[in-house]
Amino acid sequence: MAEFVRAQIFGTTFEITSRYSDLQPVGMGAFGLVCSAKDQLTSQNVAIKKIMKPFSTPVLAKRTYRELKLLKHLKHENVISLSDIFISPLEDIYFVTELLGTDLHRLLTSRPLEKQFIQYFLYQIMRGLKYVHSAGVVHRDLKPSNILVNENCDLKICDFGLARIQDPQMTGYVSTRYYRAPEIMLTWQKYDVEVDIWSAGCIFAEMLEGKPLFPGKDHVNQFSIITELLGTPPDDVINTIASENTLRFVKSLPMRERQPLKNKFKNADPTAIDLLERMLVFDPKKRITATEALAHEYLAPYHDPTDEPTAELKFDWSFNDADLPVDTWKIMMYSEILDYHNVEAASVGEMENQQQYLAQ
């Protein structure tokens, strides 16, 4: 039977197995608290994320299940990987992943990035997105704080599956807004992998400039700032707007011409400007893909078609439209965790009694 150790972090109880020691707070996200720790089994430093109240509502249970499924499925050098998962006696869920020293947000706020680092970071972001998109997954919330970096400049994308389309009035998503694709703001309907390319373009611009490209105060201001640089959206984009209020707002904006990005990024390499122009396109269908971006001249120093893999299998989203009670999500979650630990549960009852095993 596994032994659990309790610690108070930011007023939150961390209840972990004795396999992990030296807990230190790393950051607080919207849905969980992250600590660094030492894995006694491997002698590696790891990140442990406690999911807050995973079974308190069906929405939270589903979100946790989605993140678990995605972490299990996505296996790529530029995507964060799961090294352990367990459920504590208090029924909190803990994800254990590799620990990277910092994130792109911290790097960008501490010093300007040199050209070769910008190039290498963007290459790794696009390499990761090529894989993720080939698995049929859209990140939806790509931003500098979701891009982890270690001392060797290895980069990994994290926080998959948590971000959903949020209520425009919802607070606490200010930083997310800066990187949000216009089709999400304009239509709030079906969107696809192109939203991640837009976000990556905003991050690329921020690496070049040292500050956010579109720092909107709210969604209205955000969209207005975008049009100041990229001009008025074309008619085929405007025609996709379903909301009359949104349509009225867009049509009320003054007609604007797209500004050449070379005028804004005066010190950037012309090939960097060309790639950025192809990423920041209003019409998602005309936006460059991750695969195409990897083959762009700007990323030529790192591009290797033989070492930019795609996913072997598409991610199974069949659960995503399910409207299930908490207890059902809990059983499904236990099943996934047991599968991760290569344990077969003979029955649902046995699944629910496996918590002590799962923590070992």
Curated annotation (Swiss-Prot):
Transmembrane segments: none
GO MF, any single term: ATP binding
SUPFAM superfamilies found in the cross-reference section: Protein kinase-like (PK-like)
Binding site for ATP: V26, G27, M28, G29, A30, F31, G32, L33, V34, K49
Positions of modified residues (Phosphothreonine): T171
EC category: transferase
Positions of the Protein kinase domain: 20-299
Residue ranges annotated as motif TXY: 171-173
Main location, first listed in the record: cytoplasm
Means of activity regulation: Activated by tyrosine and threonine phosphorylation.
Family matches, as InterPro entries: Kinase-like_dom_sf, MAP_kinase, MAP_kinase_CS, MAPK_p38-like, MAPK_Sty1/Hog1, Prot_kinase_dom, Protein_kinase_ATP_BS, Ser/Thr_kinase_AS
Active site: D141
Cofactor(s) needed: Mg(2+)
Gene Ontology biological-process entries: stress-activated MAPK cascade
Keyword field: Activator, ATP-binding, Cytoplasm, Kinase, Nucleotide-binding, Nucleus, Phosphoprotein, Serine/threonine-protein kinase, Transcription, Transcription regulation, Transferase
GO cellular component, as recorded: cytoplasm; nucleus
Substrates-to-products reaction catalysed: L-seryl-[protein] + ATP = O-phospho-L-seryl-[protein] + ADP + H(+); L-threonyl-[protein] + ATP = O-phospho-L-threonyl-[protein] + ADP + H(+)
Top-rank taxon, per record: Eukaryota
Record PTM: Dually phosphorylated on Thr-171 and Tyr-173, which activates the enzyme.
KW Transcription regulation (keyword) present: yes
Protein's cellular compartments: Cytoplasm; Nucleus
Pfam families: Pkinase
Family: Belongs to the protein kinase superfamily. Ser/Thr protein kinase family. MAP kinase subfamily. HOG1 sub-subfamily.
Biological role stated in the UniProt entry: Proline-directed serine/threonine-protein kinase involved in a signal transduction pathway that is activated by changes in the osmolarity of the extracellular environment. Controls osmotic regulation of transcription of target genes.
Domain notes: The TXY motif contains the threonine and tyrosine residues whose phosphorylation activates the MAP kinases.
UniProt-recorded name of the protein: Mitogen-activated protein kinase HOG1
Gene name of the record: HOG1
